[in-house]
Amino acid sequence: MAQADLFGDAAYPDQGVAGVDEAGRGPLAGAVYAAAVILDPQRPIDGLADSKVLKAERRERLAEQIKAQALSWCIACASTDEIDSMNILRATLLAMQRAVEGLNQLPSLALVDGNQAPRLRCAVQTIIKGDALVPAISAASILAKTARDAELQRLHALYPQYGFDQHKGYGTALHLARLREYGPCPEHRRSFAPIKAFGISA
């Protein structure tokens, strides 16, 4: 793939290139997650793609393969409280920063999905739709998505009345109906408009 070659490890052979992506900016509940991945060019992983187009079982299998074969990977998050105190964009960038800083080696370059980048101690380049173009970003999107989905399963066990296992925190009709019935739980983002509608401030 031309885009993968353009942004690949060959240009930075000493320390590698990290792909960075997030999961969970839009939902009404739960932390926002981010991951950073430095792939091993000697151990390519087939099937990497934007996590949103992969079925859950495929994502899980790829996540395990990424963890086993990548040169370095890290998953991080910013909590619901952090989202409410600093806003979702800043919290997302904080989670990305934590993910890159958690790698066991500092990359020469971080390729970040989207058009906003965190402050890092290495060179940074943003790439629109990078999760579909650059394998390292695809890998990061898969790790972030599977980690957040696991977190929402945990929240479902704590607060089964909301159906987090079904909508993953997004503002679906079911979720909004359960919010009207039960009100927000401690993991709902009080700075988000649908939660503010219940008269609970951040």
UniProtKB/Swiss-Prot annotation:
Pfam families: RNase_HII. GO terms for biological process: DNA replication, removal of RNA primer; mismatch repair. Its EC number is 3.1.26.4. One of its GO terms (molecular function) is manganese ion binding. It comes from Bordetella avium (strain 197N). A divalent metal cation binds at residues 21-22, 113. CDD domains: RNase_HII_bacteria_HII_like. Its main location: cytoplasm. PROSITE patterns: RNASE_H_2 (PS51975). This is Ribonuclease HII. Keywords: Cytoplasm, Endonuclease, Hydrolase, Manganese, Metal-binding, Nuclease. The keyword Magnesium does not apply. InterPro entries: RNase_HII, RNase_HII/HIII, RNase_HII/HIII_dom, RNaseH-like_sf, RNaseH_sf. Its cofactor is Mn(2+); Mg(2+). Manganese or magnesium. Binds 1 divalent metal ion per monomer in the absence of substrate. May bind a second metal ion after substrate binding. Signal peptide: none annotated. Residues 15-202 form the RNase H type-2 domain. HAMAP family: RNase_HII_B (MF_00052_B). Belongs to the RNase HII family. It catalyses: Endonucleolytic cleavage to 5'-phosphomonoester.
